[in-house]
A protein has these predicted regions:
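Regulatory and interdomain segments flanking nucleotide-handling catalytic cores
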Residues: 1-277
Length: 277
């Protein structure tokens, strides 16, 4: 029975292994996590930019950076997060799940969904504590809409290897997409689809200024070109036992992941990205 059982198990694992694919080791890897049907999820949120959603995405990015092995840089814009992973810091550095594509995609998407749900709930509690404690949100349709969306967001993920020289270019591509999305979002918040049809981003900016007095350049940086996340040294206070056995607070320096809500334009400052890879 034991041999038959082992034979059956080996046969089943053989079917699994046929579809098991791996990325190339020792070159940078990109994970891109995308919100599933976020055009529906974001319905009823503030336009053109919802700060609750943006902060939630930023905190989700930070969680992924902190918890995915080998991650060295994160970037988020709109409903997507791009992560840069390396496995060559030392001669013995290992890769996340051995760069098993199925594992990386499924786990990163699951992690993003979990982290987003937790971060989203935390933002609602922080900004609308009374509404979170009551089933009656009164006449505030916005808060009611946000609360109703709790636990409904989902993400998918894709992973791929990329030459080291192309990592910054990949992020430039995503940041340029962020800028285009940003301008179009402000446009859609102020003009009809018919009025915007066939208009370039420069034309939309001109329309916003001439007809509504809105200067797109005045929006916060993270609204215009996304946010980044990287690890850096930060000063913190921590408890320490002194010679007398008493606890005192001392200043320490530790490596922490931080969110940069004012990243530069990557095409103009490539070193901002390239120093991490």
């Amino acid at each position: 029975l034991s041999k038959k059982y082992d034979s059956l198990g080996d046969r089943m694992k053989g079917y699994e292994n046929i579809a098991r694919n791996y990325l190339t080791r020792r070159i940078p890897t990109i994970i891109r996590v995308d919100g599933k049907a976020f055009h529906t999820f974001t319905r009823g949120m503030e336009k053109p930019f919802d700060r609750i959603l943006m902060t939630t995405m930023q905190n989700t990015m930070k969680y992924l950076c902190e918890n995915i092995q080998g991650c060295v840089f994160g970037y988020t814009q709109s409903d997507e997060i791009t992560l840069v992973l390396t496995d060559y810091a030392t001669i013995t550095t290992d890769a996340w799940f051995g760069y098993n594509i199925q594992k990386m995609c499924s786990v990163s998407a699951s992690m993003a969904t979990l982290a987003f749900s937790n971060a989203y709930a935390a933002e609602l509690w922080k900004n609308f504590p009374e509404a979170m404690c009551s089933s009656d949100n009164g006449t505030n349709k916005y808060i009611e809409t946000l609360v109703a969306k709790m636990g409904t967001a989902m993400f998918d993920a894709r992973v791929f290897s990329i030459p080291k020289d192309e990592v910054c270019n990949c992020l430039i591509w995503r940041q340029q997409d962020a800028t285009r999305n940003s301008i179009e979002s402000v446009g859609h918040a102020n003009f009809s689809q018919k009025e915007l049809h066939g208009k370039s981003c420069n034309s939309i900016q001109d329309m916003l200024w001439k007809e509504h007095g809105i200067n797109w350049n005045d929006f916060p940086v993270d609204c215009k070109r996304g946010s980044a996340c990287y690890k850096t040294k930060v000063k913190e206070t921590a408890p320490l036992l002194n010679d007398k056995g008493d606890t005192e607070m001392v200043e320490v320096v530790r490596n922490r992941w931080v969110i940069d809500r004012e990243p530069p334009i990557f095409s103009q400052e490539r070193g901002y990205v390239e120093k991490w890879i």
